[in-house]
Design a protein with these regions (language model features):
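Residue-identity detector for glycine
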Residues: 15, 22-24, 37
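Conserved active-site-proximal phosphate/metal-binding subdomains
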Residues: 165, 178, 186, 190-207, ...
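Detector for the Zn2+-coordinating histidines of canonical Cys2His2
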Residues: 2, 13
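Active-site entrance/lid segments in N-terminal catalytic domains of soluble metabolic enzymes
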Residues: 32-203, 207
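Ser/Thr/Pro/Gly-rich low-complexity, intrinsically disordered segments
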Residues: 9, 16-19
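Residue-level detector of alpha-helix initiation sites
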Residues: 62, 213-215
Length: 356
């Protein structure tokens, strides 16, 4: 029997920001498929050391560290997001991990405004640091110098080349199906093999993780078939028991399908988040996005009034105005389950598919 060694990466969102990530590796042997009992047989940090020389999104308080720890406990390796540069918030998330060995992810252009946050993360001796959305070279040497594997999330083959040149040891290839921030230029199904081939030619020891549209074992199996070492999972973990998501937000997300999601900059304009123009975000569409998508200049001109409406809607949890940042895979999410069950089921189902 073949043994499947996937990376399990979780990205969690509570409807406002795509800032919480998880990275991990789980060992799954089909001989033990009934119990999935050896998912955590080898610690993820040890496996990362074996494979890498020297050595896995809306905002809201309190759950990302807890969820990252739960993914780690399940045999994955949780990755806590650094948010938009608030040190107190990051330190609170570190406390939430309760000592679990996790990694940390940062929005790169935001980290550049408060680079001291990287020191907070490196002080935890993390399993990895993940950088997304911007130039990672100013931080790469510090991360590698600390003996921490550097993970880079990319949306194009050009970005993957830059990540390899900067010394990334793990590359997350994110397709436009993904929830939260990214780019819509490439799909997961074509970007992943492009990046896999590039890595094979230039840096065979670098791991490739597929992101975007993966919510179950079928997606994991497909990613492995494309040559990826594993998957980054966001929307499915948004509906994990450990995610601090309000009942109304969960209801909105679980009721939605992939056809209900849109890529737009409207949400960032209203929240006054200064994202670079090349990035937008996928979310469940609503009256706000329908009204203003394609009319961003007019939205900016009327922003004070729209922001007042948005703030009232946020207080009332009015999802015709506020939204949940989830990906196209939301149509595959039908319930709320513990993170451990999500990890075990995904790996078990992928192994069954690949060994048929």
């Amino acid at each position: 029997m073949q043994t499947v060694w996937p990376l399990i990466v979780s990205v969690t969102q509570n409807g406002q920001e795509d800032c919480s990530f998880g990275l991990g590796r789980a060992r799954y042997s089909p001989e033990n498929s009934k119990e999935c009992g050896n998912v955590a047989e080898h610690p993820p940090d040890r496996i990362l050391r074996d494979r890498i020389s020297d050595t896995a999104s809306a905002d809201g308080p309190g759950f990302r560290g807890r969820l990252a720890a739960a993914v780690t406990a399940a045999g994955g390796l949780g990755l806590v997001g650094g948010g938009y540069g608030e040190a107190d918030w990051l330190l609170a998330q570190i406390d939430e991990t309760d000592g679990a060995r996790v990694g940390y992810g940062f929005i790169t252009w935001s980290l550049a405004r408060n680079p001291g946050l990287l020191d907070n993360a490196l002080a935890q001796q993390p399993a990895t640091i993940m950088l997304s959305f911007g130039d990672l070279t100013p931080f790469a040497e510090r991360i590698r110098g600390a003996g921490v594997p550097l993970t880079a999330q990319v949306q194009t083959l050009h970005q993957a080349r830059l990540a390899l040149a900067a010394g990334a040891q793990i590359i997350v290839a994110q397709g436009g199906e993904a929830g939260g921030h990214g780019m819509g230029a490439r799909s997961t199904f074509t970007l992943v093999p492009d990046v896999v081939d590039l890595v094979a030619q230039r840096s065979a020891e670098t791991l490739v993780v597929a992101a975007g549209g993966v919510a179950d074992g079928r997606g994991l199996a497909a990613a492995l078939a494309l040559g990826a070492d594993g998957v980054l999972v966001g929307t499915r973990f948004w509906a994990a028991t450990e995610a601090l998501v309000s009942p109304r937000a969960r209801q909105r997300g679980i009721a939605a399908g992939g056809d209900d999601t849109v890529r737009t900059r409207v949400y960032d304009i209203v929240r006054q988040r200064d994202w670079p123009e090349e990035y937008d975000a996928r979310m469940v569409g609503n009256a706000l996005t329908a009204r203003w998508h394609g009319h961003e200049a007019e939205l900016s001109a009327r922003l004070p009034d729209v922001r007042k409406e948005f703030e009232r809607a946020a207080a009332a949890e009015d999802f015709d105005v506020i939204t949940v940042l989830v990906g196209e895979a939301v149509g595959l999410v039908h319930d709320v389950r513990p993170a451990a069950e999500i990890v075990h089921r995904m790996v078990r189902d992928a192994a069954r598919i690949l060994n048929q």
